[in-house]
Amino acid sequence: MKVAFFSETGNNQRYPRDFPNARTECAWAIALDAPMCALDVLPREKFDLGIVIIPKNNPKVNLDFIRKCCDKVAIMQEGPHWYFQDYDIDKQFHYYNTLRSADWVYCHNESDVKYYRGLGCEDVRVMRSLMIPEDILPRSEWGDATIIGGNFVSWYGGFDSYIVARETDATIYAPSMGRKQKQEDAIEDIQYLPYMTWREWINNLSQYNIGVHLMRTHAAGTFAMNCAFHSIPCIGYRGLDTQENCHPNLTVDVGDLETAVRKAQLLKEDMGYYDECSLQAQKGFSEYYTEYKWLENWNKQFTL
């Protein structure tokens, strides 16, 4: 099957396997040898399937335009499934009608499937998250620091993660994301990383001992997956496939900070528990998120 992706960052070209910013959508394209195409400039090639990633800030995509070069057109979820409800009213209905007009919808998590079916989308499929760790080695030496997965805004739940991370009695690190607040640099017990490319981030992640990402905004769940690649135990909220598949012992209900705190204390105090969670992460990544397993799962949807 010949596939193309369409997004606001597309330029009708294919990514190399060592692309420095190979985030999930790029990894999908790499695995399928698919170009990432523009939404407003058609490629010269024809495709069996076009997968459209609707931009968060400009949802008025015309699927009929994409159908000129694609036999089938699917929509790929971008962000949490409720994100479109912050649009202006006309854009909310345009987004809804666009979903309904697609041949099928791809979503991030099993927990998203029923939502899209409830909207009236009859064919809803899960597109697993993916990373292409080309020439990147999993960690071989264990550090003693803790990394949290986002900044101090409701989108990332950084405050929740910070409260839990303190229980590990280790130096706390955090990435610098686009929603980072200026005053965060004044938090004395967090070391902030500079902005990085995806490859720099994955290499840097290898030095940490514990991950905490209590993010209520459920989408691709790449932090939990990235930690699992390095066999790093990660505490996170239920609802993300990557979290539940790779870190089952460390998955807590949304808002259950009490249990999350206990999990962090256990990881610090009980080496046997830590090792068990680390092995679960390694096993979960191998079973669900290698490129081989991703392609195997991708091919199943067309052979059922």
What function would you assign to each model-found segment?
Residues 1-65, 115, 249-253, 296, ...:
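N-terminal pre-catalytic "stem/leader" segment of glycosyltransferase-like enzymes
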Residues 16-21, 133-135, 139-186, 192-198:
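Conserved catalytic-core segment of nucleotide-activated headgroup transferases in glycan assembly
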Residues 20, 269-303:
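A charged, aromatic-enriched C-terminal amphipathic alpha-helix characteristic of glycosyltransferases
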Residues 87-105:
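Membrane-proximal helix-turn-helix segments that form the acceptor-binding/catalytic region
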Residues 103-115, 121-136:
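Donor nucleotide-sugar binding/catalytic pocket of nucleotide-sugar-dependent glycosyltransferases
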Residues 202, 224-230, 243:
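Short alpha-helical segment that forms part of, or immediately flanks, the ligand-binding pocket
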Residues 206-219, 232:
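Acidic donor-binding loop of glycosyltransferase active sites
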Residues 248-257, 266-271:
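Conserved acidic donor-binding segment of nucleotide-sugar-dependent glycosyltransferases
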